[in-house]
Amino acid sequence: AQAAFERMEQQLVVDFYPWSRAIKLAAMPSSDYIGYFPEYYFETDKFIFSKPIGIGPLGIVEQKSRPISWHHLADLNRYTLGIVQDYVNTDSLDVMIASGSQPVEAATSDEQNIKKVAAGRIDGAVIDINVLHYLLKQPHLQPLADKLQVNRQLIANKQLYVAFRNTEEGRRWRDILRPSRKHKRRLV
C-alpha cells in the first residue's frame, strides 16, 4: 500500500492500534483516520473496500500435542476456539458463532489467543497464518513456537482489502489512481 500511495504522490501514514479500536477510529467522521487494513470483505454501509491487496490464509493454531481433527466446518463445533473480537472470519463460521453452535472465547488480539492455545485454555484459535508466523517470531512469543502448529486444514484463503470510510473522502482515497494533489491521511 505504501508504494502505491507514493507512486501516486500521496503520503500514507500507518498507525497500529488494537483491532476494535482501529475500526472505531476509522469509522469516526471527526477522526484523522480514513481507513484501516488489512480487512476481509464484508457487507457494510460504514466502509467501502479497495481492490484486493493480497491473500490471507485463514486457519487454526493448535497445540502440537492436541491437534484438532475436522473435515467440515461444523466438525469444529466440538472444540472451543479463540476468536478476536470484531474480526470478520468467514460467513459460515461467523453464522455458527452467532448462533451459538460454535463454542468460542473472544480476545482482544491474536497474541492473547496464541497464549491461550499454548496454555491449553482453548483448543485452538482462528488466525491468519501469516500473522501467526510473524507473531511467533517476536521474542516474547518465541518460547511458545515449539508447542504450537498450524492445523493441517485451512478454513479459507481470504482476499485482503483496505476498508475506507464510506464518505466522499473515502471514495477519493479508494480511487487514489486519479491523484490531483498531495494529501496526507492516516490508516490504522
Model-found features: residue ranges?
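Acidic, polar ligand-binding/catalytic clefts
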Residues: 15-75, 87-89, 152-155
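Short amphipathic alpha-helical coupling segments at ligand-binding clamshell hinges
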Residues: 72-75, 128, 169-180
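Short beta-strand-to-loop elements that line the ligand-binding cleft
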Residues: 11-18, 101-109, 113-116, 151-153
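Periplasmic-binding protein-like
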Residues: 8, 56-58, 142-178, 180-188
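Short helices/loops that flank or line small-molecule/ion binding pockets
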Residues: 20-32, 48, 111-133, 138
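Start-of-domain marker
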Residues: 1-23
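Ligand-binding cleft/hinge of the Venus flytrap
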Residues: 1-9, 50-52, 75-77, 86-108, ...
